[in-house]
Amino acid sequence: MSIGFYFDMSRCTGCRACQIACKDKNRLEVGTIYRNAHTFSVGSFPEVKCYSYSASCNHCESPACMAACPTGAIDKREDGAVILDREVCKGDGACVEACPYGVPKLWEDGKAGKCDSCYLIREAGGTPACVAACPNRALDFGEVEELKKKYGDALVSDIAVLPSSDKTKPNVYINAKEAATAAARKAGKAWD
């Protein structure tokens, strides 16, 4: 079994409610975020198109952060969630350097931290804070096969602002706007 996130670009307004909910739930320091919402523009006037993307840990099938960690502080749970144990972390930053998505962050105390898919909330029957906070329901979370059944076959894991999914096999499924995939093709990132 593998868990993952679904993101619908057609529903996201870039409000950052997901980002704020994650920051609040994790009691993160100023300047540290585990979920990051951005709005991107493609083209030039008068043919400008925009799209927003909300990024966090993709709980990859082959997590580069876990492979790079020399202390074993990063582990993949049975459900597929990639968890970082800050008590075991020695703060060498190998996970930060290894993740192609830039997900793990070093805190002021020198130790790393990252999205844990709110696994304690999920174990209590809830949903991740970011998903619960989204006013437009642009985010969802669940077992990968269930997400694919629920949202269909048109989902992608590669868009212009992300590195190729070939290396880590991220468990993020995106209902992408044409602007995000067209920009990828124009940049020579034609994954489809």
Q: What is the meaning of each model-derived region?
A:
Residues 1-192:
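Non-ligating segments of multi-cofactor redox enzymes
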